[in-house]
Amino acid sequence: MFPLETRILVIDDMPSIRDLVKNTLKAMGYKNIQEAGDGEEGLKLLLQHNSPGTQFQLVISDWNMPKMKGLDLLKQVRATAEWANLPFVLLTSESERDQVTEAVLAGVSQYIVKPFSAKIFEDKLKAAYAKHNKA
């Protein structure tokens, strides 16, 4: 599982979903959580926090947002050398096989379909951590 001091960026255009994700993370013990309302704002925060000790260590992003979709942000993250191994979880209502395949091919760490339970959310974060921290 991600250490409790992990710096997490939550990106969703719906404040209620951002609050749900933040509250779920807080209930799991995480405190260092920032948020963005769309992919563009998320990218700006990633760029602002790009020096050692300030970098985000986990991104949880919605797929469908204005300005920049989560999948487009994921592709930019994976194309940037410094972020190539950044755990990136897509949280979305998209569950069609083609969309899941597209996300996997783009390098998503885990894919969580809304609505989700706290248990599924935690299990997916554990899997994302394991994927990026293989011994």
Segments predicted by a language model, with ranges:
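C-terminal output helix
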Residues: 116-125
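Two-component/phosphorelay signaling modules centered on CheY-like receiver
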Residues: 15-34
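Short amphipathic alpha-helix used as the core "switch/output" element in two-component signaling
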Residues: 71-84
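Helix N-cap/capping motif at the beta->alpha junctions
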Residues: 35-48, 70
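Receiver (REC) domain active-site loop signature in two-component systems and cognate sites
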Residues: 65
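Alpha4 helix (beta4-alpha4-beta5 surface) of REC/receiver domains from two-component response regulators
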Residues: 22, 72, 95-110
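Active-site residues of response regulator receiver
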Residues: 62, 92
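Active-site beta3 strand of CheY-like receiver
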Residues: 50-60
